[in-house]
Amino acid sequence: MNYANLIDDTNLHADALESDIVDLCNEAKEIGSASVCVNPDYIELCKKLLNGTNVKVCTVIGFPLGSMTTESKVFEAADAIKKGADEVDMVINISKLKDHHDEYVKNEISRIKEACGNRVLKVILECCLLSDEEIVRACKLSKEAKADFVKTSTGFSKHGATVKDVKLMRQTVG
C-alpha cells in the first residue's frame, strides 16, 4: 500500500526560506503526498509550484497558539482561501475550551468553516495541553461545527501525538 498519499508534507517553521518551500513542494510531487502544509505567506508560491499535480496546498490559521480573536481567524481563513488554499488547519482556542466557553469554541469553528466554503477545515486540538474530558469536548464541538477533521497537535508545544490521544479522538468522532 502506498502511504505517501496520506501524508501532509509540512514546513511551518518561522525561518522557512523560499528555497525550503520549493524543496518541500518538489518532495511532495516526487512521493505523491496528499498536500503540503505551509505558513500563509507561501500559499501562492505552492499553488504555482504544484499546478497540474494532485498535491493540495494547506495552510494554518491561528497558529500555533490559537489565542487570537475569532474575527482574526475568520479573516485569515478567508484570505487563505482567496490566495488558493485547498485546506485550512486552525488551532482551537485552548483557553476558551478550558474555561468551558463551549459556545464560543463551537461558534469560532463554525464561522471559520463558513469562511472556508467547500474547502477542508481541520481543527488542531493541542492534546498535550488538554485533559481527556477536554479532548472529548473539543472533538464533539468540532464535529457539531461541521469541521472535516480533528488533529492532535501543532508540533510546537510540549509534545506531539500520543496513541492514547488518537484512540480517544477516534472513539469520539468516529
Positions of the model-derived regions?
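Calponin-homology-like cytoskeleton-binding modules
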Residues: 38
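Alpha/beta enzyme core
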Residues: 1-31, 41-63, 67-174
